[in-house]
């Protein structure tokens, strides 16, 4: 899927996460998992991280397995006060 072919924000987020995984996967398994989580923690705003966890909660379809593993090390955003 090229970056021009997104059908939804969800597909774009999956695409972006998989691009990050593609970059880090050459570093070996553990370094890749840590690198993916570190990148998402540093550069993704809380709303994007929340969306990541929503997609994973529904099965995580389309994610590189490294992204799914790295999610355990990604900071969960705090719930908004109502």
Protein language model annotation of sequence segments:
Residues 3-30, 54, 68-70, 81-82:
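General marker for long, soluble alpha-helical cores
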Residues 21-65:
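Amphipathic, hydrophobic secondary-structure cores in small proteins
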């Amino acid at each position: 899927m090229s970056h021009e072919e997104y059908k939804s924000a969800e597909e774009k987020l999956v695409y972006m996460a998989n691009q990050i995984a593609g970059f880090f996967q050459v570093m070996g398994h553990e370094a890749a998992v840590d690198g993916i989580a570190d990148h998402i923690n540093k550069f993704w705003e809380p709303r994007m991280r929340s969306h990541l966890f929503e997609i994973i909660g529904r099965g995580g379809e389309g994610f590189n397995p490294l992204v799914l593993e790295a999610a355990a090390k990604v900071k969960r955003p705090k719930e908004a006060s109502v």
